[in-house]
């Protein structure tokens, strides 16, 4: 991995040289508030308004759980500088299952019949089975867990990883320009990329679908294979292209790119979910999505 999380001694060595941060860490409360509001705003007159509102309910349950049951300090001293919270190898705290229970309790009163059945199933599932499903999801074996259950399990895991990321050093530096298609904090996949405004004007950051960190990747480079060739930008409405799909003819993948200069309230998870018809268009053109939205999991294998 080409982005390294710096120790305190390394931070002091680079303290006098400013450069745009390689990694941006989320403010948990602010992130959930912004995402929930954006989902509700996007739901207005949207063909998939019910699902966007369901996603907003889950995000608000994450915020409520965060405020009621924050993650206690973790023993994180001996972590690697590269992917310190690697989703496949980091020893997670079982508190994530408490988060799952609290999220389910929040959603249950509003649930329709189908969602209620999923909640009931998860409530009756043993701790060992929940951990096994979590292991599969964190190993990116998404087709081994049914998507209706994956949404809730991932919401709880993400809430845990987001808070764990607050407890590691928040300085980083780019080691080289390779292998930037996975999160340098937890090794998970991006949801989409955001072209920033403000102090990071014009810089592109990929947004992690697990720990919610963002990492810098230069534009005009494939977010999946690092190729600089055969890149194209697509949108459903060129005039209002807040969300575009960047396709790569080399690896035949795509990831969406969003532009804060067109709308400062754009939010990677919410706007990615609301632009699902762009995904359909890209798949019809033969491109495979290289990222994952925490509210859109692949169908379980039969």
Swiss-Prot record:
The keyword Oxidoreductase does not apply. The keyword rRNA-binding does not apply. It comes from the Bacteria. Necessary for formate dehydrogenase activity. GO terms for cellular component: cytosol. GO terms for molecular function: ferric iron binding. This is Protein FdhE homolog. HAMAP family: FdeH (MF_00611). Belongs to the FdhE family. One of its GO terms (biological process) is protein maturation. Keywords: Cytoplasm. Pfam families: FdhE_C, FdhE_central, FdhE_N. It is found in: Cytoplasm.
């Amino acid at each position: 991995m080409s982005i390294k999380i710096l120790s305190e001694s390394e931070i002091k060595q680079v303290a006098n040289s400013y450069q745009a941060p390689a990694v941006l860490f989320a403010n948990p409360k602010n992130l959930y508030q912004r995402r929930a509001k954006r989902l509700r705003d996007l739901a207005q007159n949207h063909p998939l308004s019910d699902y966007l509102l369901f996603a907003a309910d889950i995000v608000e349950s994450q915020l409520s759980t965060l405020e009621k049951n924050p993650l206690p300090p973790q023993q994180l001293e001996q972590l690697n500088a590269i992917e310190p919270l690697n989703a496949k190898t980091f020893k997670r705290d079982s508190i994530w299952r408490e988060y799952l229970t609290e999220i389910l309790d929040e959603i249950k009163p509003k649930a329709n019949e189908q969602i209620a059945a999923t909640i009931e199933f998860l409530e009756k599932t043993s701790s060992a089975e929940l951990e096994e499903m979590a292991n599969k999801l964190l190993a990116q074996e998404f087709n081994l867990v049914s998507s209706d259950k994956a949404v809730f399990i991932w919401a709880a895991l993400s809430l845990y990883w987001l808070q764990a990321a607050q407890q590691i050093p928040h300085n980083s530096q780019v080691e080289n320009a390779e292998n930037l298609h996975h999160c340098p904090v937890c090794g998970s996949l991006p949801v989409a990329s955001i072209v920033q405004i403000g102090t990071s004007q014009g810089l592109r950051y990929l947004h992690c679908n697990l720990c919610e960190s963002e990492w810098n990747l230069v534009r005009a480079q494939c977010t999946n294979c690092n190729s600089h060739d055969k890149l194209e930008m697509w949108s459903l409405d060129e005039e209002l292209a807040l969300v575009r799909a960047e396709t790569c003819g080399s690896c035949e993948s795509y990831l969406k790119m969003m532009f804060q200069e067109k709308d400062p309230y754009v939010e990677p998870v919410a706007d990615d979910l609301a632009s699902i018809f762009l995904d359909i268009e890209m798949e019809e053109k033969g491109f495979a999505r290289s990222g994952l939205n925490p509210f859109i999991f692949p169908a379980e294998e039969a």
